[in-house]
């Protein structure tokens, strides 16, 4: 594991432990838009991650869910969602995760998802494959929608009419459709072949 992936793993785990320790203890909820929120936990977890990155890689750029952009013209850019699934977290639904991606010259080179509730760490590095808790994983080999279990998530960017049309098409064509409320959880399930 290279230094970048090592820091991403350490930062995700540290933020994830903080999030897990504060599950059910949200003190502050800030509205970021019509159907988008951030909590005090989102902000503190993001700070944990950014501090870990800056200690080791002070010149790298950062694009973070809560605090925005910093030095994004750099060769290396870290993309951070400290608490993906905030709505679930606010409602004490244990489906959320920490998501960190690293881009080098506009190409993804490493990614980490940490699921605090299950202590599951998903890590991938360009050219080295993907792993769950240090065990190699792979995506599903299903290539027909009618045999696939897929995920759909509503988005604040699209109208309800557009979302219902897309969901209807998926529901008609897929074997099964899930809505989990956390892209990090969905992507981790795709990475290990639980979702197609």
Residue ranges and their predicted role:
Residues 108, 136-138:
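Short, solvent-exposed loop/turn motifs
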Residues 60, 128, 174-175:
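A structural micro-motif
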Residues 72-131, 148:
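DPxDG-like acidic metal-binding loop motif
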Residues 1-83, 165:
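N-terminal subdomain of lithium-sensitive/metallo-dependent phosphomonoesterases centered on the IMPase/IPPase/PAP
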Residues 30, 70-72, 105, 123, ...:
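Solvent-exposed alpha-helices and their adjacent loops that cap or buttress functional pockets
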């Amino acid at each position: 594991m290279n230094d970048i992936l090592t820091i991403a793993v350490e930062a995700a785990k540290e933020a994830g432990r903080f999030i897990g320790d504060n599950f059910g203890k949200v003190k502050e909820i800030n509205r970021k838009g019509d159907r988008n929120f951030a909590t005090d936990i989102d902000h503190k977890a993001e700070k944990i991650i950014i501090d870990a990155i800056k200690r080791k890689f002070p010149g790298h750029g950062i694009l973070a869910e809560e605090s925005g952009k910093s030095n994004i013209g750099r060769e290396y850019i870290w993309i951070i969602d400290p608490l993906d699934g905030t709505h679930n977290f606010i409602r004490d639904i244990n489906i959320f995760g920490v998501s960190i991606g690293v881009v080098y010259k506009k190409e993804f080179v490493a990614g980490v998802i940490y699921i605090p509730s299950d202590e599951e760490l998903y890590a991938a590095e360009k050219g080295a494959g993907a792993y769950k808790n240090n065990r190699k994983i792979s995506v599903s080999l299903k290539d027909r929608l009618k045999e696939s279990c897929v995920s759909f998530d509503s988005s604040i960017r699209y109208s309800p009419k557009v979302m219902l049309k897309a969901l209807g098409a998926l529901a008609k064509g897929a074997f099964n459709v899930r809505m989990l409320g956390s892209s990090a959880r969905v992507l981790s399930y795709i990475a290990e072949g639980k979702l197609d």
